[in-house]
Regions:
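C-terminal beta-signal and adjacent terminal beta-strands/loops
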Residues: 212, 218, 498, 554-557, ...
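Structural signature of Gram-negative outer-membrane beta-barrels, strongest in the C-terminal barrel
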Residues: 375-385, 396-555, 596, 604-608, ...
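Outer membrane beta-barrel strand-and-loop segments of large Gram-negative receptors
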Residues: 351-367, 407, 520-526, 532, ...
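Gram-negative outer-membrane beta-barrel transporters
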Residues: 417-418, 551-555, 559, 564-568, ...
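Periplasmic-side early beta-strands and strand-to-turn transitions of outer-membrane beta-barrels
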Residues: 171, 175-178, 195-298
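Short acidic/polar hinge/loop motifs at secondary-structure boundaries
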Residues: 118-144
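Extracytoplasmic beta-strand/coil segments of soluble accessory domains associated
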Residues: 62, 79-118
Length: 725
């Protein structure tokens, strides 16, 4: 089956051998600059030429997303915007948040870094996304492949780096306002940004919010725990979402010292469809009076972070960088109190609180950069992190725990011959975790009443065992970038990375209605270890440009969630999903191209294919992304931009054991119109996008709702207005 789709990719590629986004659209994560502060203080426009040069000097595949790209693909969901890149998918969670997947790797294998602070919002599994402001993501780097050298073990699969906004050229007050609305949720949002630059002082404030109603869907029913559940009026009851975000940043821009302080708050309140949460009950899905109310069951998320950084130019060759951060990630899931055991009593306080996960993190980083006279750059860095987690609620999924990690790294980047650049490094990490025990007396009574054996009672006496684990490992990489001539570029990167297992992989044990399953961790799991080899071949001239990026990753110990086929002993839970490890292979290819048909016409094509293989089972790994292909034609006369896009999403029949396939090929059409104008001293932009014009019904194999047979959203009109001054 997939041979056909590989052929489709090749057939699209053959007539466009020279198509792809120009090299200027990519940027390395650590640029080689002769002056340590040029990289930080220059604006995106000033650095347009240097971005192309820097890209040619890095062996990794890196995407640079500027304001033009982010505005064109804005959806109100940052992870969904990233999924427009080849090789990047998204697990959509509600209307505002999602979880990015890069080359088939997701969850805690992808690090999101905001101004040097790694966000910890993905700690708890599939229904927990990136709590970030979708309006405040300019500029962004996406590093495909292992980024563990710079960002630690959680960057095994890739890194998303949000850089601080560029400092304006002019002194004084500046700002922008953005508002958006969409038809699929009959909701919208807005964001206000104000900044002030006076001498060396720069302060910037942004406040954002979104308000969405129940989602329109193309289905009239779902299947949950083998039960048929109706969806009335094609509207998913209680799926409304509210998000808010604010950030305050202060910078001191001195001659030799640059310092910054930043504080931010991100939050969400999102309802769960009652027909797929808890014990099935058809009465709970009857229509209510409002599509905007959020009733039980629902979840709330709040992420608070503060961070400070200091850059000191000691000499023309030396620069010291220090960063310190604190964050709290608080998630609460509320559901009308229900018990799976007859002896359990209603709690006196917070009776409807099913789960509360409260994770606090302190992190620090020290870095020394040496800019050699011949143009190379050495970086010696050390970082550490300490976390402590507390749980509450009448349900159990994860225990209390404490976790500490630290690492030291040495990297080099520089030219070794004419047109040939080397990037290499080594990193050593240590990790420690202490897990607290948890005993559920109501479960013990329930099992005794059922007459279970003493062995079963002993097995289930503790939902979580007390234990400590320690890890240490080495990671490294070497990459070459060869600028063959002014038209051709070749890159290759070989690396070894590892990842410490997450708490849910070690100690999860409970019914998680948010993910529709009973998850069980394994405290004996070792760290993930993998070897990565990727390459990139590119061609560009004034008329054509093309990039082809094959990759392969082999894991000697890959941790994944496997449907076991075992029926859980807990009531109303379905089969058990167990975390286990295996040898695994991820390989695939990405292609991207652009043909400048005319000064006002462009044709763009991109596609990706990911192949996963479980060596032990000789099957695919769970949640493998389907092949995708898209192409669009864009007309951009003065002030206007009109784009028509055709997207193809392949079915997914390569599945893990006990995983459902996703049949059918999705063929989607999108249309976007943008007008850029000027009003007095202010610039404005009006964009109207029509997504899924034909209102096609299709399933996404990566979707959070795929397990209950809920199709993706139908036709959606998205209006965005931006005013900057």
């Amino acid at each position: 089956m997939y041979c056909r789709y590989i052929c489709y990719l090749l057939l699209y590629l053959i007539p466009t051998v020279a198509l792809a986004e120009p090299f200027a659209s990519r940027l390395d994560s650590v640029a080689v600059e002769p002056h340590p502060f040029d990289e930080t203080l220059q604006t995106v426009e000033v650095r347009a030429n240097s971005k192309r040069l820097q890209t040619m000097r890095i062996g990794q595949t890196i995407e640079w997303l500027d304001s033009t790209y982010l505005t064109k693909h804005f959806t109100g969901n940052f992870a969904a915007t990233l999924s427009t890149l080849p090789g990047v998918n998204v697990i959509t969670i509600g209307s505002g948040y999602g979880k990015p997947v890069i080359r088939g790797l997701g969850f805690n294998r992808i690090a999101y870094v905001d101004g040097g602070l790694k966000q910890e919002g993905q700690q708890w599994g599939a229904d927990h996304g990136l709590e970030v402001d979708a309006f405040d993501q300019d500029p962004v780097q996406v590093i495909k492949g292992a980024g563990s050298l710079l960002y630690g073990s959680d960057a095994l699969g890739g890194v998303i780096v949000r850089q601080p906004a560029a400092t304006p050229h002019k002194q004084g007050l500046y700002g922008s306002y953005t508002m958006m609305g969409q038809s699929s949720t009959m909701g919208g949002g807005g964001s206000l940004m104000m900044g002030y630059l006076h001498g060396a002082h720069h302060i910037r404030l942004r406040m954002s919010g979104q308000y969405h109603g129940d989602r329109n869907v193309t289905a009239d029913s779902i299947t949950y725990l083998t039960r048929w559940i109706p969806i009335y009026n094609h509207r998913l009851k209680n799926s409304a979402t509210q998000t808010y975000a604010s950030q305050l940043r202060y910078e001191w821009l001195g001659e030799q010292v640059k310092a910054s302080l930043q504080a931010s708050v991100n939050g969400e309140r999102s309802g769960f469809f009652p027909g797929a949460h808890g014990v099935p009950d058809l009465k709970r899905v009857l229509p209510d009076k409002s599509r905007y109310n959020i009733e039980l069951p629902y979840s709330t998320v709040r992420q608070i972070s503060t961070q400070g950084s200091l850059q000191w130019r000691v000499s023309p060759q030396w620069q010291l960088v220090g960063e310190l951060g604190w964050q709290q990630n608080l998630r609460r899931e509320l559901s009308a109190f229900h018990t799976h055991y007859g002896t359990m009593q209603r709690p006196v306080q917070d009776a409807d609180l099913e789960f509360e996960f409260d994770l606090k993190t302190v992190s620090a980083r020290l870095q020394a950069n040496y800019y050699a006279p011949w143009g190379g750059k050495w970086t010696l860095a050390t970082d550490g992190q300490y976390q402590w987690h507390k749980r509450r609620g009448y349900g159990f999924l994860l225990p209390d725990y404490q976790r500490a990690t630290s690492g030291v790294s040495l990297t080099y980047q520089g030219r070794i011959a004419q047109g040939l650049y080397l990037t290499s490094g080594l990193r050593y990490d240590l990790g420690y975790i202490a897990m607290s025990p948890y005993h559920d007396p109501y479960l013990a009574d329930y099992l005794q009443e059922r007459g279970e054996s003493s062995a079963t009672l002993a097995q289930y006496y503790y939902s979580s065992q007390e234990g400590e684990r320690r890890w240490h490992d080495l990671s490294g990489s070497v990459g070459l970038a060869w600028q063959i001539n002014r038209h051709w570029l070749w890159k290759v990167n070989l690396g070894r990375s590892f990842r410490l297992p997450g708490i849910y992989e070690l100690a999860a044990n409970g019914i998680h209605h948010g993910t529709f399953r009973h998850e069980v961790g394994d405290p004996s799991l070792g760290s993930e270890q993998g070897w990565l080899l990727d390459s990139e071949v590119g061609f560009h001239n004034d008329l054509w440009s093309c990039t082809v990026s094959p990759f392969i990753t082999y894991f000697t110990n890959y941790i994944y969630l496997q449907p076991s086929g075992e029926w859980s002993i807990l009531p109303h839970s379905g089969q058990i999903y167990r975390y286990q490890s295996t040898r695994a292979l991820f390989t695939g290819i990405e292609l991207e191209g652009t043909w400048h048909l005319h000064p006002q016409w462009d044709y763009h094509l991109q596609g990706d294919y990911v192949y996963t293989y479980n060596v032990a089972d000789r099957l695919a790994l769970p949640y493998s992304p389907p092949a995708r292909l898209s192409h669009d034609l864009t007309w951009h006369p003065t002030h206007w931009t009109l784009s028509l896009k055709h997207r193809i999403i392949a079915p997914q029949h390569r599945i893990a054991r006990n995983e459902a396939p996703t049949p059918g090929t999705a063929t989607l059409l999108d249309l976007a119109v943008t007008y850029d104008g000027q009003l007095r001293q202010s610039n404005y932009r009006i964009s109207l996008a029509i997504q899924n014009i034909l209102n096609s019904r299709y399933y996404d194999h990566m979707s959070y709702y795929r397990r209950v047979n809920l199709p993706e959203a139908g036709r959606n009109l998205l209006l965005t207005i931006n005013l900057s001054f």
